[in-house]
């Protein structure tokens, strides 16, 4: 009897997952077998994660997993304003230097995060009311932090979370004092500080192509680019609820229409971490030519800011979830091609008997 297509697909999946089971512990896996290497094999720049001194010096499995599985790192907190310039003109780079040294030592691409953000902002900044003062403070902060790592970082999130849910600019000290011109000031200063770094605007809830927030992002970025503001990329944080991965493709495609060189998924975590949701997001990036990579926002669930939702690729025991192994397949098309190859092979043998 000739097996039907469902039986063939099931056989293919068994073979695929058997291969994953034999691949060895993820903390000791060779880089050539990593999820990052497989992502790069599909033409992308990286599949990364986050780190900081605290997490790197916590559970020893965290740095081991990062070294073996991810090709890019973003700092979770060490490059934010309250960490780098807690008092005016007094810069502290202890945490960020530790992070950068770890990333460089282990050959990881680095994304800087973040220069201008309304949150984790020292009160001495948020209390400024004078345009000239705030402009000078912004320029000095951006220039000093970026020059500390000039030539070492692939990209920077220059401005972060500047939109409300209706697509208008968020109320912050920057927008209140400078209006939307703070965006131009930030990006022009960043370009001068490190001309080689890719400069991003980054935000959350950009997960539906039809949402007012996403549409507001696209329209503003188009306008700013037309005015000469040097925005190279849009970062979609992609903090998702369960079942929301299916909309990722449409959302990334919509963001890509804004006219930037790049888009990226910058802070991925998904409630429940189902393989379906993670594969949907991976495929969304693979299918969008401007999407350069994905950064997962944490290694294992205990370290996540959403720990109670189990949103990451590694569980509380630092073991890989099904979503990690399935994501290694990288795309439905890749898996479907394997189904077809296996099916054709079996059918040809059956017909030749």
Curated annotation (Swiss-Prot):
<keyword id="KW-0858">Xylan degradation</keyword>
<comment type="function">
    <text>Hydrolyzes oat spelt and birchwood xylan randomly, yielding xylose and xylobiose as major end products.</text>
</comment>
<feature type="domain" description="GH10">
    <location>
        <begin position="50"/>
        <end position="330"/>
    </location>
</feature>
<comment type="pathway">
    <text>Glycan degradation; xylan degradation.</text>
</comment>
<dbReference type="Pfam" id="PF00331">
    <property type="entry name" value="Glyco_hydro_10"/>
</dbReference>
<protein>
    <recommendedName>
        <fullName>Endo-1,4-beta-xylanase</fullName>
        <ecNumber>3.2.1.8</ecNumber>
    </recommendedName>
</protein>
<feature type="active site" description="Nucleophile">
    <location>
        <position position="267"/>
    </location>
</feature>
<keyword id="KW-0326">Glycosidase</keyword>
<dbReference type="GO" id="GO:0031176">
    <property type="term" value="F:endo-1,4-beta-xylanase activity"/>
</dbReference>
<dbReference type="GO" id="GO:0045493">
    <property type="term" value="P:xylan catabolic process"/>
</dbReference>
<keyword id="KW-0378">Hydrolase</keyword>
<comment type="similarity">
    <text>Belongs to the glycosyl hydrolase 10 (cellulase F) family.</text>
</comment>
<comment type="subunit">
    <text>Monomer.</text>
</comment>
<dbReference type="InterPro" id="IPR001000">
    <property type="entry name" value="GH10_dom"/>
</dbReference>
<keyword id="KW-0624">Polysaccharide degradation</keyword>
<feature type="active site" description="Proton donor">
    <location>
        <position position="161"/>
    </location>
</feature>
<dbReference type="GO" id="GO:0005576">
    <property type="term" value="C:extracellular region"/>
</dbReference>
<dbReference type="InterPro" id="IPR031158">
    <property type="entry name" value="GH10_AS"/>
</dbReference>
<dbReference type="InterPro" id="IPR044846">
    <property type="entry name" value="GH10"/>
</dbReference>
<keyword id="KW-0732">Signal</keyword>
<keyword id="KW-0964">Secreted</keyword>
<dbReference type="InterPro" id="IPR017853">
    <property type="entry name" value="Glycoside_hydrolase_SF"/>
</dbReference>
<keyword id="KW-0119">Carbohydrate metabolism</keyword>
<feature type="signal peptide">
    <location>
        <begin position="1"/>
        <end position="23"/>
    </location>
</feature>
């Amino acid at each position: 009897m000739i097996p039907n297509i469902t039986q063939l697909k099931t056989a293919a999946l068994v073979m695929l997952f058997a291969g994953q089971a034999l691949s060895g512990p993820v903390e000791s896996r060779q880089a050539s077998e990593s999820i990052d290497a497989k992502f790069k094999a599909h033409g992308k720049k990286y599949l990364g994660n986050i780190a900081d001194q605290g997490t790197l010096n916590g559970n020893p499995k965290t740095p081991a997993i990062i070294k073996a599985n991810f090709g890019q790192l973003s700092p979770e907190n060490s490059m934010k304003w309250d960490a780098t310039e807690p008092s005016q003109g007094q810069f502290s780079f202890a945490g960020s230097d530790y992070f950068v040294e770890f990333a460089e030592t282990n050959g990881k691409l680095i994304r800087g995060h973040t220069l201008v953000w309304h949150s984790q902002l020292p009160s001495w900044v948020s209390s400024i009311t004078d345009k000239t003062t705030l402009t000078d403070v912004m320029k000095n902060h951006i220039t000093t932090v970026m020059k500390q790592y000039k030539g070492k970082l692939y990209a920077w999130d220059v401005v972060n979370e500047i939109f409300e849910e209706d697509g208008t600019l968020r109320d912050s000290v920057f927008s209140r004092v400078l209006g939307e011109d703070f965006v131009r000031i930030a990006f022009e200063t960043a370009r001068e500080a490190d001309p080689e770094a890719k400069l991003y605007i980054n935000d959350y809830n950009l997960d539906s192509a039809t949402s007012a927030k996403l549409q507001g992002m696209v329209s503003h970025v188009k306008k700013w680019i037309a005015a000469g503001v040097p925005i190279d990329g849009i970062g979609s944080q992609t903090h998702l609820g369960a079942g929301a991965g299916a909309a990722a493709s449409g959302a990334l495609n919509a963001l890509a229409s804004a006219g930037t060189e790049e888009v990226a998924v910058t802070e991925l975590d998904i409630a429940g971490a189902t393989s379906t949701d993670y594969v949907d997001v991976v495929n969304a990036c693979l299918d969008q030519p401007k999407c350069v990579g994905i950064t997962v926002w944490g290694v294992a669930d205990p370290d996540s800011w959403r720990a109670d939702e189990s949103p990451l690729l590694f569980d509380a025991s630092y073991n890989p979830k099904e979503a990690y192994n399935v994501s290694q397949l990288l795309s439905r098309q890749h898996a479907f091609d394997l189904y077809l190859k296996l099916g054709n092979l079996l059918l040809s043998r059956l017909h030749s008997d």
